């Protein structure tokens, strides 16, 4: 059995965004500024709340992050949709890490709740995804539950995050 990498540095994530990690016609993380994490600290396919795998990543908050200047003027807050997108990014990364081919696309989410916010005075965001189901047949898809924590407090939760991988020509 081949031992897979269980954590990824910022440079590794940039390699993914440049298409160097999984090869041509396969998923890649978005490039900055849409890359919403600085590192993946843990990834496995056996633990997590549902026993199907877990992925954990972090984003260091700096007051000069691009979205604070425009969302909102005089009341800077990280857009909640960026935290949601980060969770989709991680579910797609998990599918590729498992060795699946194709380009990743977010397919939906069952429920999202926001109970806090990320502001320039925060220090660290932590994303945690617990995989619930991984389908690796003709359809390649993962479903997971996620949470976004800032400085140790959970501020967003998402149930049934869905991401699929598609080969060229399969995407409409």
Curated annotation (Swiss-Prot):
GO biological process: unsaturated fatty acid biosynthetic process
Subcellular location: Cytoplasm
UniProt gene name: fabA
Keywords: Cytoplasm, Fatty acid biosynthesis, Fatty acid metabolism, Isomerase, Lipid biosynthesis, Lipid metabolism, Lyase
Location of the active site: 71
Function of the protein: Necessary for the introduction of cis unsaturation into fatty acids. Catalyzes the dehydration of (3R)-3-hydroxydecanoyl-ACP to E-(2)-decenoyl-ACP and then its isomerization to Z-(3)-decenoyl-ACP. Can catalyze the dehydratase reaction for beta-hydroxyacyl-ACPs with saturated chain lengths up to 16:0, being most active on intermediate chain length.
Protein name: 3-hydroxydecanoyl-[acyl-carrier-protein] dehydratase
Domain of life of the organism encoding this protein: Bacteria
Assembly mode: Homodimer.
């Amino acid at each position: 059995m081949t031992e897979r990498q269980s954590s990824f540095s910022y440079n590794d994530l940039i390699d993914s965004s440049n298409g160097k990690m999984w090869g041509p016609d396969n998923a890649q993380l978005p490039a900055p500024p849409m890359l919403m994490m600085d590192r993946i600290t843990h990834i496995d396919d056996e633990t997590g709340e549902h026993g199907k795998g877990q992925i954990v990543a972090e984003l260091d908050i700096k007051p000069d992050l691009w979205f604070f200047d425009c969302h909102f003027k005089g009341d800077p807050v990280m857009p909640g949709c960026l935290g949601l997108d980060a969770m989709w990014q991680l579910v797609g990364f998990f599918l590729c890490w498992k060795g699946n081919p194709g380009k990743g696309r977010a397919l939906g989410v069952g429920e999202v709740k926001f109970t806090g916010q990320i502001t320039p005075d925060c220090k660290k965001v932590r994303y945690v995804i617990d995989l619930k189901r991984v389908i690796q047949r003709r359809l390649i898809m993962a479903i997971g539950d996620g949470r976004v924590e800032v400085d140790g407090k959970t501020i967003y939760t998402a149930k049934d995050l869905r991401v699929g991988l598609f080969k060229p020509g399969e995407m409409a």
